């Protein structure tokens, strides 16, 4: 089946059949981008990536200089029992993404609390999820797919890169 039909045809077929239908493993490989232990649906693979895969567990030195204080503060916030949704706000180029990369390095190399060892940091590039949407419903479908993915993978930390494009949307001056 996978050799005869294109991915677009299979995408259409699965969307017609329904979400809860079992998909044979050979067909499923076409629909998921397999990362270490996490399969990102192909629909989301152009918007999401796993930041932990950027680093190797054997790395002894982090190539991200500084940001130690900010990274430790982020770890403290994420360790709290409640109200642990952190948002990094700052001017462009001050190192918001570097803080999250440093956190991913600490998780990958094991330089963090035990409860963080199995976490994956998934980066959502919000500009690309909004780009190319012809109507509002199209963007909503993409966000719904994202929410389903996150519900199926509770061991994820979602980092929304360029979140100001959503927060500032619709603002008037």
Where are these regions (language model features)?
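Histone-fold recognition with a strong bias for associated Lys/Arg-rich disordered tails
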Residues: 1-130, 139-172
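Flexible, glycine- and charge-enriched loops at secondary-structure boundaries
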Residues: 136
